[in-house]
């Protein structure tokens, strides 16, 4: 699997007309996802049996897809063998997977992914940017904070916001501003 690296790979996962940030766990040559029950992603994996990993480096898209639906024009139809899938426009690469539910818990589905096709659309070098990485972490914490209102998660979000302000560029700062609107934190440090 050329596009995935060992560990957790943060992507925007698309299912049928749905997009959400997702971590693909890649260990010992096996790709898996943990998908929370009740999510659109879980429902569509159960119904259709596929998922597309979209590789892009736009922090605003990660924040937006965590909290809202994208318009239909943001999706591109692709035919992968006998399966019609949707990916996002403007991605640098994408990979379509068969998604098989291996295990179910009260909270999540454990899904094994089998690569069907991967495509590199453009090659771009992305130096490590702590601001971008912190947007990913803050967004993960924010989705959990919305459910639990855990003060510890609020503290983590504030910590990452500080790093974004220090290390991020204009697009990371825009993503942080958008994230703040979803959480109603205002401009607090």
List each model region and its residues.
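Eukaryotic intrinsically disordered, low-complexity regulatory regions
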Residues: 137-177
